[in-house]
Amino acid sequence: MSDSKEPRLQQLGLLEEEQLRGLGFRQTRGYKSLAGCLGHGPLVLQLLSFTLLAGLLVQVSKVPSSISQEQSRQDAIYQNLTQLKAAVGELSEKSKLQEIYQELTQLKAAVGELPEKSKLQEIYQELTRLKAAVGELPEKSKLQEIYQELTWLKAAVGELPEKSKMQEIYQELTRLKAAVGELPEKSKQQEIYQELTRLKAAVGELPEKSKQQEIYQELTRLKAAVGELPEKSKQQEIYQELTQLKAAVERLCHPCPWEWTFFQGNCYFMSNSQRNWHDSITACKEVGAQLVVIKSAEEQNFLQLQSSRSNRFTWMGLSDLNQEGTWQWVDGSPLLPSFKQYWNRGEPNNVGEEDCAEFSGNGWNDDKCNLAKFWICKKSAASCSRDEEQFLSPAPATPNPPPA
């Protein structure tokens, strides 16, 4: 038994020595003899104790190294902070610029609200109107020109009704219109212009001396008022004088509307544009007239002369639309046999459904009703009485001529 134990102890000793070498311990005789004396279980506990002790020693040996690393890290942080401080110092100007930008932004918003937008707008509008008003104030030379024109007009009107004088008055009124058109108060300027235009037409038709005298008196008062411009009260006085003058002119007799021609108690309008026969009837009806119906040889000669003088093909109110070959006027009356002499040679021939009559050259011709031609409207002239009561009453309104 003793012999067998010895080799086993030797083997155990060798094993323990190998394990201790693996853990970094040096072999000693005392430890080896101690291991040989101890059992296998206590040996494991001893090994664990030595292992823990060795690990603790290793950690303790590393502490100075960790402190050194921390110090290096702090030095690096310090250097970074130093560099950052220098960089921040360079950014001070930029931050100030940013601050200025923000201040300007706030100032812009504040100025946008000062003092009250509505009041600023109102002030702007008032200044704009004031500028326009000042720009329209008449120059003294213009006022003097108006005064001179009215003085001349007064003398000219007193010498009516010579035709040359009427023409001269027309030219003077045209110049007066341009001068008055520069006065302030634009709406009243326009009204003055329109009134002077109507006055021009009325003066051109004046035959009665009493009416001339009335206009002379009105113009005399107007001259006195214009001579004292540009005071606003005087301008108002001129406006009132022109209003009175308008009333006087409206009481004058106008047998025919403007741009119509008077002949034997009727008014005639010769168009400046072309329409077909049916549309020509409509155009005349719109102004209280009808496509011309010829009632006498004198009227025929007058109208034929008007048409041939302008070298136009012009519709009249005659057709055979209701029954081929039976010619009838638009008022329903038949064509009298005595009027058949006015047809041109070989007419009417009804070539290609020609059912409407026209003035052509020195006579009449039939043509297609859908062709566009000039036309003539006819209506009765207004009666002009010399009775004073009739003279003082306003003339009936006359419609404008049809679209030319």
UniProtKB/Swiss-Prot annotation:
Keywords: Adaptive immunity, Calcium, Cell adhesion, Cell membrane, Disulfide bond, Endocytosis, Glycoprotein, Host cell receptor for virus entry, Host-virus interaction, Immunity, Innate immunity, Lectin, Mannose-binding, Membrane, Metal-binding, Receptor, Repeat, Secreted, Signal-anchor, Transmembrane, Transmembrane helix. It comes from the Eukaryota. CDD domains: CLECT_DC-SIGN_like (cd03590). Residues 96-257 are annotated as: 7 X approximate tandem repeats. Sequence repeats lie at residues 96-118, 119-141, 142-164, 165-187, 188-210, 211-233, 234-257. Predominantly expressed in dendritic cells and in DC-residing tissues. Also found in placental macrophages, endothelial cells of placental vascular channels, peripheral blood mononuclear cells, and THP-1 monocytes. InterPro entries: C-type_lectin-like, C-type_lectin-like/link_sf, C-type_lectin/snaclec_domain, C-type_lectin_CS, CD209-like_CTLD, CTDL_fold. GO terms for cellular component: cell surface; cytoplasm; external side of plasma membrane; extracellular region; host cell; membrane; plasma membrane. A motif (Endocytosis signal) lies at residues 14-15, 16-18, 31-34. Pfam families: Lectin_C. The chain crosses the membrane at residues 38-58. Ca(2+) binds at residues 347, 349, 351, 354, 365-366. Residues 1-37 are cytoplasmic. Residues 59-404 are extracellular. Changing residue 349 to D: Loss of binding to ICAM3 and HIV-1 gp120. GO terms for biological process: adaptive immune response; antigen processing and presentation; B cell adhesion; cell-cell recognition; endocytosis; heterophilic cell-cell adhesion via plasma membrane cell adhesion molecules; immune response; innate immune response. In vitro, is a receptor for HIV-1 and transmits HIV-1 either in trans without DC infection, or in cis following a DC infection to permissive T-cells to induce a robust infection. Bound HIV-1 remains infectious over a prolonged period of time and it is proposed that bound HIV-1 is not degraded but protected in non-lysosomal acidic organelles within the DCs close to the cell membrane thus contributing to the HIV-1 infectious potential during transport by DCs from the periphery to lymphoid organs. Homotetramer. Interacts with C1QBP; the interaction is indicative for a C1q:C1QBP:CD209 signaling complex. Interacts with ICAM2 and ICAM3 by binding to mannose-like carbohydrates. Interacts (via C-type lectin domain) with CEACAM1 (via Lewis X moieties); this interaction is regulated by the glycosylation pattern of CEACAM1 on cell types and regulates contact between dendritic cells and neutrophils. (Microbial infection) Interacts with HIV-1 and HIV-2 gp120. Pathogen-recognition receptor expressed on the surface of immature dendritic cells (DCs) and involved in initiation of primary immune response. Thought to mediate the endocytosis of pathogens which are subsequently degraded in lysosomal compartments. The receptor returns to the cell membrane surface and the pathogen-derived antigens are presented to resting T-cells via MHC class II proteins to initiate the adaptive immune response. The tandem repeat domain, also called neck domain, mediates oligomerization. This is CD209 antigen. It comes from Homo sapiens. The lineage of its organism: Eukaryota, Metazoa, Chordata, Craniata, Vertebrata. The gene is CD209.
